[in-house]
Amino acid sequence: GKYAAQLAEKELPALEDFVEYGSQRRINIVVYNNFNDLQQSNVGLGIDWQNTGGVTKFVNNKMIVYFNGDHENLKKQIRQGIAKVLLENLLFGDDLGEFASNQALLDLPKWLTEGYIMYAAENWSPALDDQLKSALLSGNYRNFYQFAFDKPELAGHAFWRFIADNYRKDNVTYFLYLARIYKSLNSASLKVTKKKFKEVLNEFMEKEADKYYKDLRGRRNA
């Protein structure tokens, strides 16, 4: 537990800089010995594991993590948890009343918020690139929404990386901030990209798939 707290203190400033938002909330962390212990605990039994995806969970304002001897995995869980708190503060405010009313008004897709948490917590990697490549070249997805429905965290992480690469990294958090101000993803998208939100999603599918097709053709011709 002490190691997890030290890790959280160490990671917090960099993530606050990234999200451009400080946390006023005290973050409590509960550490389990392994994932099975967490799932079987009273806390774990209250979580719908099938539908909650891979982002670090919170129960009664406590960050729930597990440590199985893999320090990098624990660090990733804690970074995700901190990013989640900071993102919720950014979108919904620190005050509980403000939080509830903003949450009701701002209904963002899960892939978008969880993807942002992944993007903030973990650098893009060759493994993620391989996953994206096989998803986009599989022919299973006619549009972004089908992809995001099937693989929300991967789609969301890749989307924010796409925004950073094509529309400046500074605009990643700004995009979400504008969505909060305007209560609209379309307005935020028009401001950042000069395109409607759906057009940006189509652009993502075309550009990313095209990049992988070119890569494949290049290898065949080599």
Which ranges hold each PLM region?
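Soluble non-cytosolic domains of exported or imported proteins
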Residues: G1-K10, G69-Q77, D107, W111, ...
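Zn2+-dependent metallopeptidase catalytic core
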Residues: G1-V30, N34-F35, R79-I82, L86-N89
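Short, solvent-exposed loop/turn elements at domain surfaces
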Residues: G1-Y3, D37-S41, A127
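Beta/coil-rich, acidic/histidine-enriched accessory regions frequently appended to metallopeptidases
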Residues: K10, Y145-D150, Y174-A222
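Sec/Tat-exported extracytoplasmic proteins
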Residues: E11-V19, G81-I82, L86-D94, Y116, ...
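Charged, often glycine-rich, active-site loop that binds/positions anionic groups
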Residues: F35-T52
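Zinc-dependent metallopeptidase catalytic helix centered on the HExxH motif
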Residues: T52-A127, S134, T173
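Long, well-structured alpha-helical subdomains associated
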Residues: P126-A179
